[in-house]
From Swiss-Prot:
Record EC number: 1.1.1.25
Entry's Gene Ontology BP terms: amino acid biosynthetic process; aromatic amino acid family biosynthetic process; chorismate biosynthetic process; shikimate metabolic process
Similarity comment text for this entry: Belongs to the shikimate dehydrogenase family.
HAMAP family with a match to the protein in the record: Shikimate_DH_AroE (MF_00222)
Keywords assigned: Amino-acid biosynthesis, Aromatic amino acid biosynthesis, NADP, Oxidoreductase
The protein's assembly and partners: Homodimer.
Signal peptide: none
Transmembrane segments: none
Record's protein name: Shikimate dehydrogenase (NADP(+))
Gene label: aroE
């Protein structure tokens, strides 16, 4: 890295565990691009605006945005893409000649591994846990790409979740969305697809290992279980799903899917996706 190297970074809080630097630096090096990707941990939301103003002044190339700032960054950007405007959440920022443009590549990144199940999801009920930026992307993905009967959004505080969603979404668009209390988790049994859009299950976290009590035998072989957590590769939720013969989707698929689009937005090049996947999987297997 030298003075002519263009810098890209992940904006988040306590995200040193992230594999985004490995993904993007592998791709930059493979294509011979003079770019470097790093992590910027921002301690509190009040500092996000300062960070983005500094990035503009320093000429940084762009950012990935993760927990908990996907919505926090929105007011500080100069422009939003259509899909980011729709859900008022951003996970990718491009610095285009001093103009910071926000995108949401989570929507298609989330949807991509589900396209193989499109027929199975037609007319189905879906269980979605989480109410942050990742959950917003999932809700919008179902609106754009799939035809479920109903999406059940499980929330610890239903009223708070509804208020949060209303601040980001035009809720009248989502006629099949129902917000239900977390205490109704037994309804998971009736769902075809179960999604974890929370950090629960992430390696090193002390706040629980799964979105539902795994000893409750709610999962069955007809389920498709999608965990957005990617470290560990096989989370406690996915382990429980595999044990009963359910189909599983690993979080690494969404991670790489959204990163692939961000890479193209930053560089105009196509990411060498298979090389990236092999590199990340090899790293995860070392742990």
């Amino acid at each position: 890295m030298n003075s002519s190297t263009r810098i890209f970074a992940l904006l988040g809080r306590a995200v040193d565990y992230s594999y985004s630097p490995l993904i993007h630096n592998t791709a930059f090096q493979a294509l011979g691009l003079p770019y470097h990707y790093t992590i910027f941990n921002i301690a509190e939301a009040a500092l996000v605006g300062d960070a983005l103003r500094g990035a503009r002044a320093l000429g940084l190339g762009g950012f990935s945005v993760t927990i908990p700032y996907k919505q926090t960054v929105v007011p500080f950007l100069d422009e939003l893409s259509e899909e980011a405007t729709t859900i008022q959440a951003v996970n990718c920022i491009v610095n285009k000649n001093g103009k910071l443009i926000g995108y949401n590549t989570d929507i298609l990144g989330f949807a991509s591994p589900l396209f193989a199940y499109r027929e199975a999801l037609h007319g189905a009920t879906i269980a979605l846990f989480g109410s942050g930026g990742a959950a917003l992307a999932a809700i919008e993905a179902f609106q754009r790409y799939f035809t479920p009967k109903q999406v059940l959004l499980f929330a610890r505080d239903s009223q708070k979740a509804k208020s949060q969603l209303r601040s980001s979404l035009a809720l009248e668009r989502y006629t099949n969305l129902a917000i239900v209390p977390l205490s109704d988790y037994e309804r998971v049994r009736e769902c075809r697809l179960v999604i974890n859009a929370t950090p629960l299950g992430t390696k090193g976290r002390a706040d629980g290992s799964a979105i539902i009590p795994l000893e409750s035998n709610l999962l069955h072989s007809e389920h498709i279980v999608y965990d957005m957590v990617y470290n560990p590769t096989i989370t406690p939720l996915l382990q429980a799903a595999q044990a009963v013969g359910a189909s599983t989707i690993f979080g690494i698929e969404m991670l790489i899917g959204q990163a692939e689009q961000a890479f193209t937005l930053w560089t105009g090049e196509k990411m060498p996706t298979e090389l990236v996947r092999q590199t990340v999987m090899a790293k995860l297997q070392e742990l």
